[in-house]
Amino acid sequence: MESVEPALPPRKVADSRSEMTELVLPNDANTLGNLLGGRLMHHIDLVGAIAAYRHARTHVVTASMDHIDFIAPVHVGDLLILKSTLNRAFRTSMEVGVKVWVEHTVDGTMRHVASAYLTFVAVDRQGRRVRVPPLETETEEDKRRYHDAGRRREQSQHERERKLHAHAGS
């Protein structure tokens, strides 16, 4: 007889939202005074992991950064504001969306500079995958992101299968 795992109570999107603020310093930049892309990716990974952890309430590891758009340069002295939102929870993995803005410290204006989607996997102390709670969507925006995350996951799975078949044939 197969054992059935007890259902985990759902958690709301709002419960895992995260925000992080960082001042861009000269050590974070290239010789032109622009923020290094790798440094921005590091911040994106951190704020995404915080949202995933808040949802799963256990250790999480980054499985992929599926898509990242660098929209505009970020300069030394800019204030980075990174916001992450859990888009969807699957069995042991979660998709998190991250948006990055720059607040100009002189006039307070905001500019969208980057966006990314990341997948995190919940694990125990031994690194074994563990189930995550389902995600409870409340707003139309939550529902749209939930649906879009499912579509992106299907596309990623098809792409992985295509690559496996292409590799097996070579």
Regions found by a protein language model. Give the residues of each.
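HotDog/MaoC-like acyl-thioester-processing domains
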Residues: 5-20, 75-79, 87-170
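Short alpha-helix capping/helix-loop boundary micro-motifs
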Residues: 65-68
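A conserved, well-ordered hydrophobic junction motif at loop->secondary-structure transitions
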Residues: 29-42
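Active-site helix/loop of acyl-thioester processing domains in fatty-acid/polyketide metabolism
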Residues: 39-57
